[in-house]
Amino acid sequence: MTEIAHARTGIDIHPGATIGEGFFIDHGTGVVIGETTVIGKNVKLYQGVTLGALSFPKDEATGMLMKGHKRHPNVEDNVVIYAGATILGGETTIGHDSEIGGNVWLMESIPPFSRVYNQTPYPRIKAKKET
């Protein structure tokens, strides 16, 4: 079922993810939501958002991957995450009523009522040399 949905929409939501009511994806191509992600109520995501894992822990004795560990972020209620944002890690929580700007890369928690964005310089435009 997940593969059919991904093929038709370009959205990849692991069936183990927990998603609250009022969840909305706008222009969903490229959205990835990992297995242990927890999403609160009234959360809105835009295209290309990743709610992913930093790593998949291995058992030191056997080298086998260990299941049952929280690897993906928590997104509390009333959060908007704009296009291209990547939020990683099982201990990462996005506090309620926050906004995550486009192309932001987060691996740490932010408090409620936060706005996170990249502060980038303006693009430089140069004349192209004639040949």
Q: Whereabouts are the PLM-identified features?
A:
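Terminal amphipathic alpha-helical/low-complexity segments used for targeting or macromolecular assembly
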Residues: 1-9, 130-131
